[in-house]
Amino acid sequence: MQTNIGLIGLAVMGKNLVLNMIDHGFSVSVYNRTPEKTRDFLKEYPNHRELVGFESLEDFVNSLERPRKIMLMIQAGKPVDQSIHALLPFLEPGDVIIDGGNSYFKDSERRCKELQEKGILFLGVGISGGEEGARHGPSIMPGGNPEAWPLVAPIFQSIAAKVQGRPCCSWVGTGGAGHYVKAVHNGIEYGDIQLICEAYGILRDFLKLSATAVATILKEWNTLELESYLIRIASEVLALKDPEGIPVIDTILDVVGQKGTGKWTAIDALNSGVPLSLIIGAVLARFLSSWKEIREQAARNYPGTPLIFEMPHDPSVFIQDVFHALYASKIISYAQGFMLLGEASKEYNWGLDLGEIALMWRGGCIIQSAFLDVIHKGFAANPENTSLIFQEYFRGALRHAEMGWRRTVVTAIGAGLPIPCLAAAITFYDGYRTASSSMSLAQGLRDYFGAHTYERNDRPRGEFYHTDWVHTKTTERVK
């Protein structure tokens, strides 16, 4: 039997994708670098006739129908290049290699070009949803060689999550576009998680609410505008107690791991000149969390903060303020993420459909939320507008939330609570809507010490001037 698709890499994600494909009627050949994993997987599912395992890479490739479609679910970086190199002797022009791991988008750009020269079609595919999503329907973000997309679309769109009958999978763009969109997804995920943590910290440390009480609040919020996968599971995490009745959250060390995709998003934003302040703040917050011993030492040296504000007489009013702060900050986080996608689309000539990306994230992935429907509708109504902040719905939402948002941020800072992303969000909002900022002084200083010149606000853009700040005190146009 020749199978529909082959998959290399039988870790959790790879195995669950295979089972998902089989559930949807596709036959799958599997291979793993360590043959024991292949044998164990086949023993675990002995009745799946559509599942065939191989210990020889050549036999694995020869088992596939032409054009061959081979999906790599392995560690990003050198292992991907090594696997591609090992496969090439057995492939023919028109065969497809699919990298479904968390690869850096520029690596995917390079691989796409290198393999095209050899006649092999390459796809760099972002997959979100974790173990559960891979098994029952992930969000899939395919990019790479467009000739390969029609060959794999029936498989990917069958196994992807569905929302209102639409698969959370559609063509993203050429080269590294798929992996880039996945990286931005992960950056937004970092921001979402950090914002939820900061809201939890305020409710816990300022209002002195228990984990169980906060879980109840989040469960209610999940029925409102904040409805999302992350709010739902945050409520579940906070609610769970161990056999002794202690909330499990109270036993978890406050040190957060990361795999690097959030950092990639932050670095690319810096390289592209996009003010991704909230997501960068979320990445830095994870770095700071890893300094556990230093934080403990600092806590001993700088104990307590005198409260500037008294506890509210009606906590429910302040809880509503925190809700507004979280929702408004979430809008800013997504606005920044989509701004980055818009800039990358222009820079790399990808032609990204931002509304379609919002739909792809609507189900199956970690940041899935009802919120994304609104984003999709906004981009569908005005595709040229890449800023959520200018969309009518979000303009109204930000104005409605603003006072509670400000009260929350001021109260938290006054109480000495760390809120890097809530603060970054409102600072961005204020900076974004400031027509005449204080940054004129920064450019004046640059001209003073480095003769970097400046534009004048009473002259056309593109004219540059320099002032002799020390000697003649005169100004001249230099270009």
Swiss-Prot record:
<feature type="binding site">
    <location>
        <begin position="9"/>
        <end position="14"/>
    </location>
    <ligand>
        <name>NADP(+)</name>
    </ligand>
</feature>
<protein>
    <recommendedName>
        <fullName>6-phosphogluconate dehydrogenase, decarboxylating</fullName>
        <ecNumber>1.1.1.44</ecNumber>
    </recommendedName>
</protein>
<feature type="binding site">
    <location>
        <position position="102"/>
    </location>
    <ligand>
        <name>NADP(+)</name>
    </ligand>
</feature>
<keyword id="KW-0521">NADP</keyword>
<dbReference type="Pfam" id="PF03446">
    <property type="entry name" value="NAD_binding_2"/>
</dbReference>
<feature type="binding site" description="in other chain">
    <location>
        <position position="259"/>
    </location>
    <ligand>
        <name>substrate</name>
    </ligand>
</feature>
<keyword id="KW-0570">Pentose shunt</keyword>
<dbReference type="InterPro" id="IPR006183">
    <property type="entry name" value="Pgluconate_DH"/>
</dbReference>
<dbReference type="InterPro" id="IPR013328">
    <property type="entry name" value="6PGD_dom2"/>
</dbReference>
<feature type="binding site">
    <location>
        <position position="452"/>
    </location>
    <ligand>
        <name>substrate</name>
    </ligand>
</feature>
<feature type="active site" description="Proton donor">
    <location>
        <position position="189"/>
    </location>
</feature>
<feature type="binding site" description="in other chain">
    <location>
        <begin position="128"/>
        <end position="130"/>
    </location>
    <ligand>
        <name>substrate</name>
    </ligand>
</feature>
<keyword id="KW-0311">Gluconate utilization</keyword>
<dbReference type="Pfam" id="PF00393">
    <property type="entry name" value="6PGD"/>
</dbReference>
<feature type="binding site" description="in other chain">
    <location>
        <position position="190"/>
    </location>
    <ligand>
        <name>substrate</name>
    </ligand>
</feature>
<comment type="pathway">
    <text>Carbohydrate degradation; pentose phosphate pathway; D-ribulose 5-phosphate from D-glucose 6-phosphate (oxidative stage): step 3/3.</text>
</comment>
<dbReference type="GO" id="GO:0004616">
    <property type="term" value="F:phosphogluconate dehydrogenase (decarboxylating) activity"/>
</dbReference>
<feature type="binding site" description="in other chain">
    <location>
        <position position="286"/>
    </location>
    <ligand>
        <name>substrate</name>
    </ligand>
</feature>
<dbReference type="GO" id="GO:0050661">
    <property type="term" value="F:NADP binding"/>
</dbReference>
<dbReference type="InterPro" id="IPR006184">
    <property type="entry name" value="6PGdom_BS"/>
</dbReference>
<comment type="similarity">
    <text>Belongs to the 6-phosphogluconate dehydrogenase family.</text>
</comment>
<feature type="binding site">
    <location>
        <begin position="32"/>
        <end position="34"/>
    </location>
    <ligand>
        <name>NADP(+)</name>
    </ligand>
</feature>
<keyword id="KW-0560">Oxidoreductase</keyword>
<dbReference type="GO" id="GO:0006098">
    <property type="term" value="P:pentose-phosphate shunt"/>
</dbReference>
<dbReference type="GO" id="GO:0019521">
    <property type="term" value="P:D-gluconate metabolic process"/>
</dbReference>
<feature type="binding site" description="in other chain">
    <location>
        <begin position="185"/>
        <end position="186"/>
    </location>
    <ligand>
        <name>substrate</name>
    </ligand>
</feature>
<feature type="binding site">
    <location>
        <begin position="74"/>
        <end position="76"/>
    </location>
    <ligand>
        <name>NADP(+)</name>
    </ligand>
</feature>
<feature type="binding site">
    <location>
        <position position="446"/>
    </location>
    <ligand>
        <name>substrate</name>
    </ligand>
</feature>
<dbReference type="GO" id="GO:0016054">
    <property type="term" value="P:organic acid catabolic process"/>
</dbReference>
<dbReference type="InterPro" id="IPR006113">
    <property type="entry name" value="6PGDH_Gnd/GntZ"/>
</dbReference>
<dbReference type="InterPro" id="IPR006115">
    <property type="entry name" value="6PGDH_NADP-bd"/>
</dbReference>
<dbReference type="InterPro" id="IPR006114">
    <property type="entry name" value="6PGDH_C"/>
</dbReference>
<feature type="binding site" description="in other chain">
    <location>
        <position position="102"/>
    </location>
    <ligand>
        <name>substrate</name>
    </ligand>
</feature>
<dbReference type="InterPro" id="IPR008927">
    <property type="entry name" value="6-PGluconate_DH-like_C_sf"/>
</dbReference>
<feature type="active site" description="Proton acceptor">
    <location>
        <position position="182"/>
    </location>
</feature>
<comment type="subunit">
    <text>Homodimer.</text>
</comment>
<comment type="function">
    <text>Catalyzes the oxidative decarboxylation of 6-phosphogluconate to ribulose 5-phosphate and CO(2), with concomitant reduction of NADP to NADPH.</text>
</comment>
<dbReference type="InterPro" id="IPR036291">
    <property type="entry name" value="NAD(P)-bd_dom_sf"/>
</dbReference>
